[in-house]
């Protein structure tokens, strides 16, 4: 088992039995990250100009072309914003828990750029730990059991969402390996 996961599981297990000390700085940062996520999803202006982001690489090409050409598409379902917000909040909690577990995060939420065939692609990776880039993903129990729990090779073989390419672009852009 990976050392990072062991540290996280140890903290979480201990917290079920006793009070754990978490610094006020970590708690305050978690609160700020949650406020930022809420504002981002509900109150910030949306960029109307099309651009490919590293996180959208897994979308079907025809969908990206329609977005670029401003073709009308169906509105996302009413619960779409909640799913995206939950992902942001889980990410904030995961980072706070990693810090509380004593994991040294070298950088977080860092914007990176890459150029492919003359097209500038932006992205924001989640965390850098031990000079490696990691991307935090939230998943339903089904997705976890059937995709992520089976390891990286399983994700690589059936990567409908472009996670492997996304991680590779973060890695290439930062000059650091993908964890």
Residue ranges of each PLM-predicted region?
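Metal-dependent nuclease catalytic cores that hydrolyze phosphodiester bonds in DNA/RNA
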Residues: 1-133, 140-157
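Metal-dependent nuclease catalytic cores in nucleic-acid-processing enzymes
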Residues: 92-101, 155-179
